[in-house]
Swiss-Prot record:
D-glyceraldehyde 3-phosphate binds at residue 174. Keywords: Lyase, Pyridoxal phosphate, Schiff base. The keyword Lyase applies. Its EC number is 4.3.3.6. Pathway: Cofactor biosynthesis; pyridoxal 5'-phosphate biosynthesis. It is an enzyme of class 4 (lyase). One of its GO terms (biological process) is pyridoxine biosynthetic process. In the presence of PdxT, forms a dodecamer of heterodimers. The active site is at residue 90. This is Pyridoxal 5'-phosphate synthase subunit PdxS. It comes from Mycolicibacterium paratuberculosis (strain ATCC BAA-968 / K-10). The gene is pdxS. Belongs to the PdxS/SNZ family. The keyword Amino-acid biosynthesis does not apply. One of its GO terms (molecular function) is pyridoxal 5'-phosphate synthase (glutamine hydrolysing) activity.
Length: 303
């Protein structure tokens, strides 16, 4: 494990072991986007393992356009005080000062998120400089390993946020899983070439090839709107689920939230899945990913 970049003697930076351990505690759970303390309480009551505090869910960000930034500190603190479960908040890609502010507010995790407008199109945040663990998105294994090398303690497959269309989430999860399986079949000398192709450090590539999994927790996100969506992503190898617009843009948020939590737990039991899928009211209308122009796709942000 690489702890060379994470000295903790000063007390100001957390070790990789501690940060990754905090993310591990969320495994098997659902993390829900919330915009008010009331929504946060609904999410907690439904069984969410954490909430993501933000001013606009991805569907609204997509619809309204403009520059999307870190949420107001008052709003984040209101949600922190409303619930007992961990609270995450989003910072723009590369915006290390937004991350510094979020850490000072006492959030439990920071999501360096492509849902917000990137602040830097060259650099991501140096996440080793922070005590708080970071979550980052990835569409493939190379992207995931680059974020881990920068200090990310959890990876989420990106999907396409704010659409209610799960197709990109499945594409990204399958890509990460397929590339890991390919690494496992390579010889030691072939891993050098693979590291170059993935644009990732050789040591991390070897660690993944030997373990058959990422060295951090892997969640899924982007377009999950039904219990069946959540269960499918778990069956594809996700260790937990982020749900954004899919809950509070639906007809009965409390019931849908509880159903998605149950589906994530019992993801391989079709009888339970059939039961929790009944009578949920209308799902979010959503957008077909194929109808979104390439420059408008949030998953393309990040490098």
């Amino acid at each position: 494990m690489n702890t060379a970049h994470s000295p903790d003697g000063s007390g100001r930076t957390g070790t990789a072991r501690v940060k990754r351990g905090m993310a591990e505690m969320l495994k098997g759970g659902v993390i829900m986007d919330v915009v008010t303390p009331e929504q946060a309480k609904i999410a907690e009551g439904a069984g969410a393992v954490a909430v993501m505090a933000l001013e606009r869910v991805p569907a609204d960000i997509r619809a309204q356009g403009g520059v999307s930034r870190m949420s107001d500190p008052d709003m984040i603190e209101g949600i922190i005080s409303a619930v007992t479960i961990p609270v995450m908040a989003k910072a723009r890609i590369g915006h290390f000062v937004e991350a510094q502010i979020l850490q000072s507010l006492g959030v439990d995790y920071i999501d360096e998120s492509e849902v917000l407008t990137p602040a830097d199109y060259t650099h991501h945040i140096d996440k080793w400089k922070f005590t708080v663990p970071f979550v980052c998105g990835a569409t493939n294994l190379g992207e995931a390993l680059r974020r881990i090398n920068e200090g990310a303690a959890m990876i989420r497959s990106k999907g396409e946020a704010g659409t209610g269309d799960v197709s990109n989430a499945t594409t990204h999860m399958r890509a990460i899983g397929g590339e890991i399986r390919r690494l496992m079949s390579l010889s030691e000398d072939e891993l050098y070439v693979a590291a170059k192709e993935l644009q990732a450090p050789y040591e991390l590539v070897v660690e993944v090839a030997r373990a058959g999994k990422l060295p951090v927790t892997l969640f899924t996100a982007g377009g999950i709107a039904t219990p069946a969506d959540a269960a499918m992503m778990m069956q594809l190898g996700a260790e937990g689920v982020f749900v954004g617009s899919g809950i509070f843009k639906s007809g009965d948020p409390a019931q849908r939230a509880a159903a998605i939590v149950k589906a994530t737990t019992f993801y391989d039991d079709p009888d339970v899945l059939a039961k929790v899928s009944r009578g949920l009211g209308e799902a979010m209308v959503g957008i077909n990913v194929e109808q979104i122009a390439q420059p408008e796709r949030l998953a393309e942000r990040g490098w």
